[in-house]
Curated annotation (Swiss-Prot):
Xref: InterPro entries: IGPD_sf, ImidazoleglycerolP_deHydtase, ImidazoleglycerP_deHydtase_CS, Ribosomal_Su5_D2-typ_SF
Gene name tied to this protein: hisB
Chemical reaction(s) catalysed: D-erythro-1-(imidazol-4-yl)glycerol 3-phosphate = 3-(imidazol-4-yl)-2-oxopropyl phosphate + H2O
Assigned protein family: Belongs to the imidazoleglycerol-phosphate dehydratase family.
Enzyme class: lyase
Keyword Lyase on entry: yes
Protein name: Imidazoleglycerol-phosphate dehydratase
GO biological process, one term: L-histidine biosynthetic process
EC number: 4.2.1.19
GO CC annotations, alphabetized: cytoplasm
Pathway: Amino-acid biosynthesis; L-histidine biosynthesis; L-histidine from 5-phospho-alpha-D-ribose 1-diphosphate: step 6/9
Keywords, comma-separated and alphabetical: Amino-acid biosynthesis, Cytoplasm, Histidine biosynthesis, Lyase
Domain of life of the source: Bacteria
Pfam families, per database record: IGPD (PF00475)
Length: 208
């Protein structure tokens, strides 16, 4: 895992539902901005397939998203993918603020041709990822993207957003379809969980 050397911008306030993070290490330079309402995506990580997946998070998550990342791709893509997950998680945590008035729970089942993926999200304040995904055997890379990094990305996102996510790949033959459905289902579950439902905090504990 990358050594952390983060510099964060101040929180923009609950009403804005915005988050922004700048994070620089010896391995990567990452900047993430998001707003929890539909908007444009501007993604550049040096990994075209990963850019495409982050665009799915923006589109299906109902969020405006900007991600700029430069990493040591000559070594491996792991640092870049993981650090983008860290930045996105921290920005999401800022945007959620105290979670008052949010649905808290979200669930989505997304098909992509022969692939079917389920994702469930709880804005619990307790980081947890269950990644139940037996990916199709054989092919491991999609356009230079190591599919194993999908779990690492989600783990970083979960840890830094402090949310609970369960992903279940029910079935699928085409690796591209399976991975894309994972991102789409997670995004749609996040969109449902972050939807507004009044003003009350969705917890009997009084905090999340």
């Amino acid at each position: 895992m990358s050594r952390r050397a983060a510099v964060k911008t101040p929180r923009a306030g609950a009403a804005a539902r915005r988050g922004a993070v700048a994070r620089r290490t010896k391995e990567t330079d990452v900047a993430v901005e998001l707003r929890l309402e539909p908007g444009e995506a501007a993604i550049s990580t040096g990994l075209p397939f990963f850019d495409h997946m982050l665009d799915q998070i923006s589109r299906h998550g109902g969020m405006a998203l900007t991600v700029r990342a430069k990493g040591d791709l000559q070594v491996d893509a792991h640092h870049t993918v993981e650090d983008v997950g860290i930045g996105l998680g921290e920005a999401l945590r800022q945007a959620l603020e105290d979670k008052a008035g949010l649905a808290r729970y979200g669930h989505a089942v997304v098909p992509l041709d022969e692939a079917l993926v389920e994702a469930v999200v709880d804005l619990s304040g307790r980081p947890h990822l269950t990644f139940n995904a037996k990916l199709p055997s054989g092919k491991k890379f999609i356009g230079g993207y190591d599919v194993d990094l999908t779990q690492d990305f989600l783990q970083a996102l979960v840890n830094h957003a402090r949310i609970c996510v369960h992903v279940n790949v029910r079935y699928g033959r085409n690796l591209h379809h399976v991975v894309e459905a994972i991102f789409k289902a997670t995004a749609r579950a996040l969109r449902a969980a972050t939807a507004r439902e009044g003003t009350a905090l969705p917890s009997t504990k009084g905090t999340l």
